[in-house]
Amino acid sequence: MAETDEADVQTKKSKTLIIRHLPRELSRDEKEDLLKYFGASSVRVLSEKGPLKHMAFATFSSETSASKALNRLHQLRILGRTLVVEFAKDQDSASILKDPPVSDRTAAAVAEKEKKEKQQPSVPLMDTSIAPSLGLKFQTNPTLKYLYPPPSSGILTNITHTLLSVPKFYVQVLHLMNKMNLPSPFRPVTAPPPMFEMPSGPLPPPFPPENPPLPEHDESGSEEESEYESEDEEERERMIRLMGLVNQPCKRPLRTKTSSKRKKPKLKDLLFIPKPDSHGPSGPVLQPADVFEQPHALGQKKIEFHISSEVSAILEGPGQNQKLPFADATEDTPDMEVSAQETTEGFGKIYPSAQVPRQEEEQEEDEDIPSEFISRRELERGRLSRDEIKKLSVFKKYEPGEPTCRLYVKNVAKHVEEKDLKFIYGRYIDISSEEERNMFDIVLMKEGRMKGQAFIGLPSERSAQKALKETNGYVLKDKPLVVQFARSAKPKQESADPKKGGRKH
């Protein structure tokens, strides 16, 4: 049996071997060097893809050297792969011998490629980048368009001066006229065409934004809009406003018209006689007697006080019964000073009380607030005026809502943090009171549908009303705050519902 196998091997011997399962880690040259090390005279390595991948044909000088190489290479492990080596069939050996070795073919291909490159003329490549000499090698944006003004006599005169001073520009203009099939300028002067006169006005409007604003809904739909879904509309409004500011032409500042409102005369202007102006025109001087009616001399009037029995029972003596109501009457009118002698003779004269200036009140109020919070001046300086608030669509259909001790703030900028809101709304609590510090809280939404909104909890409705009045419209990080009272579900009074069986005691 072994003799028959050896006989078959002897009959199938050839000079070419087929080597399968070559390691993929080896390159083409390394595979050729490996097989030539075992005595191969020429090697053809097949491609690394397809059904014949990781295979090679090796041709030897004789069948004896091929059989020796087969015995040494068959079942040899290289880089974790076991080689399978066989004698090639006559058809395979004929095709292999017909084709040149791989190394020879690659050299011939390289030589042929170089020959073709030499035959082709070197055409200079046009560099269409912006400024290659300055390092700007990227291409220009094809969507950009120039916005030239319409022709005028001044512009055409300047172009004529440039044509006279730059000969190359003159030649290029002639080339362009020839390319556009325009009439030749080398002839008598033609009649001037009518000039296109553009009315002086602002520049054309800018291109429409990428995200145009959506059409407005009906009033019924706008009333049902949730207060948490206002971020997209506000962002679009902000982008449109910024685009308008960028593309808006420069304008002269309008002169503010002085309002011709008639000043109403005040009581103090009528009481005190103004000093006569030496430079002004002399006129009749009015006396108080000419303006006010003179009090008539009447008899002494009696003042009666009607006191209830409950009040008289509380008072200790009869002397106090007469003094106490008079004191109450004077306390009810702290802004007036009435003398006892004048009350006996008519109503007397009324003088305005000395009012503390507003600046002093603001200074006293700011002194009570710690320096770590915003001052009243900074609030007024950063708050929008009423006219500016009416122009913004963020405040369209704005309503403060029912007063509660919790504020709802929207249109908050992305870069605003809780410490910024604490810096503003911390002035409306008493830092020394632990109870108010615990009741003061800030919830700022930075993600989801409620992004750009915040809730401020204050100790009382009074402080919340004051905070809403002073902070609504305050510009924080380039966006005005829209402050409202937060919606709260108030419990219904049980006495108002007749189905629940009346009031509980």
UniProtKB/Swiss-Prot annotation:
SMART domains: RRM (SM00360). GO terms for biological process: digestive tract development; liver development; mRNA splicing, via spliceosome; pancreas development. It comes from the Eukaryota. Disulfide bonds: none annotated. Residues 193-214 have a biased composition (Pro residues). Residues 491-505 have a biased composition (Basic and acidic residues). This is RNA-binding region-containing protein 3.
